[in-house]
Curated annotation (Swiss-Prot):
UniProt organism field: Flavobacterium johnsoniae (strain ATCC 17061 / DSM 2064 / JCM 8514 / BCRC 14874 / CCUG 350202 / NBRC 14942 / NCIMB 11054 / UW101) (Cytophaga johnsonae)
Protein family: Belongs to the bacterial CoaD family.
Binding sites annotated in the UniProt record for substrate: 9, 41, 73, 87
Keyword flag Transcription regulation: no
InterPro entries for the chain: Cyt_trans-like, PPAT, Rossmann-like_a/b/a_fold
Alphabetized GO MF terms: ATP binding; pantetheine-phosphate adenylyltransferase activity
Catalysed transformations (reactions): (R)-4'-phosphopantetheine + ATP + H(+) = 3'-dephospho-CoA + diphosphate
Name of this chain's protein: Phosphopantetheine adenylyltransferase
Annotated function: Reversibly transfers an adenylyl group from ATP to 4'-phosphopantetheine, yielding dephospho-CoA (dPCoA) and pyrophosphate.
GO cellular-component term (any): cytoplasm
Amino acid sequence: MRKAIFPGSFDPITLGHEDIIKRGIPLFDEIVIAIGVNAEKKYMFSLEERKRFIEETFKDEPKVSVITYEGLTIDLAKKQKAHFILRGLRNPADFEFEKAIAHTNRKLSKIETVFLLTAASTSFISSSIVRDVLRHGGEYEMLVPDAVRVKK
């Protein structure tokens, strides 16, 4: 079984995340969207809200499940018996950052990282940009799935 972990904080999930997941569905038998929890990080949306946004976005997709976790992604992948970590790349800076993590993960396990390039239409979107737009009362709706389109 080809099982992949798609990790992130998803604060909130964006159309870029959604695009990568949808394009990953034909590649894997199962995709586990793993919401990382970092006690030292301040989030705009609660863990419950972030999980609900993702579950609502993929409610009709049986190959997608959503979990939360603390600790190293590679440890979660092993625990979940996943052979792949799915990541999206928006730009060369993302690639350099993700490449170092992928090499480290490969040293620690047999788990492969699969990179998908973001679509040109979503490559400018990040959760931090969405949060900034929200904080300033801007129009954020075109950046996120329908499930997130609720003003804070």
